Each structure stands twice: as C-alpha cells, then as structure tokens.
C-alpha cells in the first residue's frame, strides 16, 4: 500500500492509503476539496473513511465526499455518529479495509470518544499523539491521555505514526525548553527546523524514534524526573504527564 498526505487548512494532514488497484482509504477528511483533487489526479476509488474524533477539522469534508462517492463506508467512534459515520466502531474492534485489518484503539483525552486505527505499520492517531507532543485536553483528563499514550507507545518499534497536524517544530521547541541538553531532542529539532524551512512535511515518524524525542512519552525517564523534581516532587508518571501538559498549555 502507498501512504499519502494531503495538506488541509493551516496545519492539518489528511492521510490516504491506496493499493495497487487504486482503491483508497481516507483518514479524517476535514475538507473535501483537496481530497477530491487528489482523487482525480491519482484516479483513486475511495472505499472507506476513518474518523478519529468529532472536531470539524477532521470531519468537515465527509458529507461532500459521500455525496460524490456513495459507496464509501465511514468508520468512526460514537461521537461522530452525527458527522456522517455509517459504521460505529469501538475499542478492541476491527475494520477490514483494502484487504487489511485495522485495530481500533480507544484513546480518550483530546475528546472523550477519540479512537485510533492501527494496521502494521500504520497508526492513524488523529489528535492523540503528535511528533514531539500530544493533543490538548479538551474533554478528557490528564490521566486518560496518559493511559492513551501508553497504549500507543506500546505498539511495535517500526510503527509509522501518522499524526493529523504539523505541530512538530513548536513541539520540539517546547521539548528543548524542558530538556535543553538532550542530544536526541537537539538532533531532531535541527532536522525538523531544516524540513520546515523548506516547507516540507515532518511526518510520518517512526515510533521507536518518537519515544526518544517526545517528552510526553518519557515520564519515567530519569533526566525528565530530575528536571521536574527541581520544581516539584511528583511520584507518579501520570502526575509528571499532567505537569508537562500544563506547561505546554502555557508555552
């Protein structure tokens, strides 16, 4: 299968998987126009849409796409039922698309009903995990998001993390503010800075590398614990995650 990214709005990515026959899966189409343009340019035949959560920048293009291609099956969590979803899926279930089985993973935090889709090596994680960061807590709690990220971090090393936004540079600036001497973070920041200077995408990322540079996945890392302990003593990784998320909200 081929993985494609379609830019939308200011910083969204709509992901598309297509097979050799031209059948395709569309993930979080917040805007129909760039997707329709890509479909026409590549002669794709849309079979399915995956929705991760109910926010408009992830679901806004569904209606128009389904009107154009009524055969499309729209998978999504319960919270997207009024956004065009025709097949509600929940944690532990699977969606069989393009001859591949995608596992549904509940990842509450950004929204209460947020889900991700995984079929090795592809992880479509919406607004749960970003490169160098994680989603804001609009509906869920820090504890929920921490547990959600633990689930995703436990996936295979070679997982391709397909995030829904180009937030990597700002996330790495935050990471440097927390761990300014970390070699992995510094190296990745330089790489991302060069890519963004050329207006190039920083995604997808390999999960093994992401665990090294994403402070939100390093809440049990001794270097991070020492930094946090300089300000406040927090015993549990969930508490350290909440501390980081609060810092990032104000960054």
Swiss-Prot record:
<keyword id="KW-0378">Hydrolase</keyword>
<dbReference type="InterPro" id="IPR032282">
    <property type="entry name" value="HAGH_C"/>
</dbReference>
<feature type="binding site">
    <location>
        <position position="165"/>
    </location>
    <ligand>
        <name>Zn(2+) 2</name>
    </ligand>
</feature>
<dbReference type="InterPro" id="IPR017782">
    <property type="entry name" value="Hydroxyacylglutathione_Hdrlase"/>
</dbReference>
<keyword id="KW-0479">Metal-binding</keyword>
<comment type="pathway">
    <text>Secondary metabolite metabolism; methylglyoxal degradation; (R)-lactate from methylglyoxal: step 2/2.</text>
</comment>
<dbReference type="GO" id="GO:0009636">
    <property type="term" value="P:response to toxic substance"/>
</dbReference>
<feature type="binding site">
    <location>
        <position position="55"/>
    </location>
    <ligand>
        <name>Zn(2+) 1</name>
    </ligand>
</feature>
<feature type="binding site">
    <location>
        <begin position="245"/>
        <end position="248"/>
    </location>
    <ligand>
        <name>substrate</name>
    </ligand>
</feature>
<comment type="function">
    <text>Type II glyoxalase that catalyzes the hydrolysis of (R)-S-lactoylglutathione to (R)-lactate and glutathione. Is more efficient than the isozyme GloC, and plays a major contribution to methylglyoxal (MG) detoxification in E.coli. The two isoenzymes have additive effects and ensure maximal MG degradation.</text>
</comment>
<feature type="binding site">
    <location>
        <position position="57"/>
    </location>
    <ligand>
        <name>Zn(2+) 2</name>
    </ligand>
</feature>
<dbReference type="InterPro" id="IPR050110">
    <property type="entry name" value="Glyoxalase_II_hydrolase"/>
</dbReference>
<comment type="subunit">
    <text>Monomer.</text>
</comment>
<feature type="binding site">
    <location>
        <begin position="165"/>
        <end position="167"/>
    </location>
    <ligand>
        <name>substrate</name>
    </ligand>
</feature>
<dbReference type="GO" id="GO:0009408">
    <property type="term" value="P:response to heat"/>
</dbReference>
<keyword id="KW-0862">Zinc</keyword>
<feature type="binding site">
    <location>
        <position position="58"/>
    </location>
    <ligand>
        <name>Zn(2+) 2</name>
    </ligand>
</feature>
<dbReference type="GO" id="GO:0004416">
    <property type="term" value="F:hydroxyacylglutathione hydrolase activity"/>
</dbReference>
<dbReference type="Pfam" id="PF16123">
    <property type="entry name" value="HAGH_C"/>
</dbReference>
<feature type="binding site">
    <location>
        <position position="53"/>
    </location>
    <ligand>
        <name>Zn(2+) 1</name>
    </ligand>
</feature>
<feature type="binding site">
    <location>
        <position position="110"/>
    </location>
    <ligand>
        <name>Zn(2+) 1</name>
    </ligand>
</feature>
<keyword id="KW-0216">Detoxification</keyword>
<protein>
    <recommendedName>
        <fullName>Hydroxyacylglutathione hydrolase GloB</fullName>
        <ecNumber>3.1.2.6</ecNumber>
    </recommendedName>
</protein>
<feature type="binding site">
    <location>
        <position position="127"/>
    </location>
    <ligand>
        <name>Zn(2+) 2</name>
    </ligand>
</feature>
<dbReference type="GO" id="GO:0008270">
    <property type="term" value="F:zinc ion binding"/>
</dbReference>
<dbReference type="Pfam" id="PF00753">
    <property type="entry name" value="Lactamase_B"/>
</dbReference>
<comment type="similarity">
    <text>Belongs to the metallo-beta-lactamase superfamily. Glyoxalase II family.</text>
</comment>
<feature type="binding site">
    <location>
        <begin position="136"/>
        <end position="138"/>
    </location>
    <ligand>
        <name>substrate</name>
    </ligand>
</feature>
<feature type="binding site">
    <location>
        <position position="127"/>
    </location>
    <ligand>
        <name>Zn(2+) 1</name>
    </ligand>
</feature>
<dbReference type="GO" id="GO:0019243">
    <property type="term" value="P:methylglyoxal catabolic process to D-lactate via S-lactoyl-glutathione"/>
</dbReference>
<dbReference type="InterPro" id="IPR035680">
    <property type="entry name" value="Clx_II_MBL"/>
</dbReference>
<dbReference type="InterPro" id="IPR036866">
    <property type="entry name" value="RibonucZ/Hydroxyglut_hydro"/>
</dbReference>
<dbReference type="InterPro" id="IPR001279">
    <property type="entry name" value="Metallo-B-lactamas"/>
</dbReference>
